[in-house]
Curated annotation (Swiss-Prot):
Biased composition (Basic residues): 157-175
Protein name, UniProt field: Histone H1.5
Residue list for modification N-acetylserine: S2
Composition bias type Low complexity, residue spans: 9-19, 176-208
Keywords of the record: Acetylation, Chromosome, DNA-binding, Nucleus
Function: Histones H1 are necessary for the condensation of nucleosome chains into higher-order structures.
Cellular component annotations (GO), alphabetically ordered: nucleosome; nucleus
Similarity field: Belongs to the histone H1/H5 family.
Pfam families to which the protein is assigned, alphabetical: Linker_histone (PF00538)
Location in the cell: Nucleus; Chromosome
H15 domain: residues covered: 37-113
Lineage of producing organism: Eukaryota, Metazoa, Ecdysozoa, Nematoda, Chromadorea
Residue ranges with Basic and acidic residues bias: 145-156
InterPro entries: H1/H5 (IPR005819), Histone_H1/H5_H15 (IPR005818), WH-like_DNA-bd_sf (IPR036388), WH_DNA-bd_sf (IPR036390)
Organism the protein comes from: Caenorhabditis elegans
Length: 225
């Protein structure tokens, strides 16, 4: 039997996910955040214009001098001018700056006047307050009317008392009673007159009777003598 030599092939190692992750982390370089040595150009421009206080407006050259004197902008003058021009144009477009004369970045610049909020809101709030106060006054007026109505109702009830109703009734009764007294007086007056007229007739009769009686007595007494 002849022996056959078998050649062994080396095992190939497959890369794992962990090895890929470590390689990726090794290749990435952390970025260092560069802190700006100065604020944005528009902020520096507004500061320069407010401090320069030029009636006609501050020129780009005056603004550039103020910025470079206060902040460290580096030695690249052309780059600084380019940033300054673009910031001036953006300031005019955004109405932060007003260009008094010139075109583009050339000329003079002033700060835009801050627009006051419309007074309509204040007027509206004032109207609301007035409406509230008027409503309160109206409510209080209604309450006052109710109280006055109650008071007047009480007064009317007091006025309609039985005493005042009884007084005119008494007056009417007295007037009616007075009328018959007058008629009675008129009726009694002729009766009294008739009685007075009838009285002398009786007196005359009595006189006649007295005259006749002594004549009869004289006739009876004559034979006795």
């Amino acid at each position: 039997m002849s022996d056959v030599a078998v050649a062994e092939t080396p095992a190939v190692k497959t890369p794992t996910k962990a090895s890929k992750a470590t390689k990726a982390k090794a290749t990435k370089i952390p970025k260092v955040k560069v802190v700006a040595a100065h604020p944005p150009f528009i902020n520096m421009i507004t500061e320069a214009v407010s401090n320069l206080k030029d009636r006609k407006g501050s020129s780009r050259v005056a603004i550039f001098k103020f910025i470079t004197a206060k902040y460290t902008l580096g030695d690249q003058v052309n780059k600084t001018n380019a940033h300054l021009r673009s910031a001036l144009k953006k300031g005019v477009v955004s109405k932060v700056l007003v260009q008094t004369n010139g075109i583009g970045a050339n000329g003079r610049f002033r700060l835009a006047v801050a627009e006051k909020p419309p007074a309509v809101k204040k007027a509206a709030t004032g109207e609301q307050k007035v409406m509230k106060t008027v409503a309160k006054k109206a409510v209080s007026g209604d309450k006052a009317k109710k109280t006055v109505a109650k008071k007047t109702g009480d007064k009317v009830k007091k006025v309609k008392s039985p005493k005042r109703i009884a007084k005119p009734a008494v007056k009417k009764v007295t007037k009616k009673a007075a009328a018959p007294t007058k008629s009675a007086a008129n009726e009694t007056a002729p009766k009294k007159a008739a009685a007075t007229e009838a009285a002398p007739k009786k007196a005359a009769v009595t006189k006649a009777a007295t005259k006749k009686t002594p004549a009869r007595k004289a006739v009876g007494t004559a034979p006795k003598a």
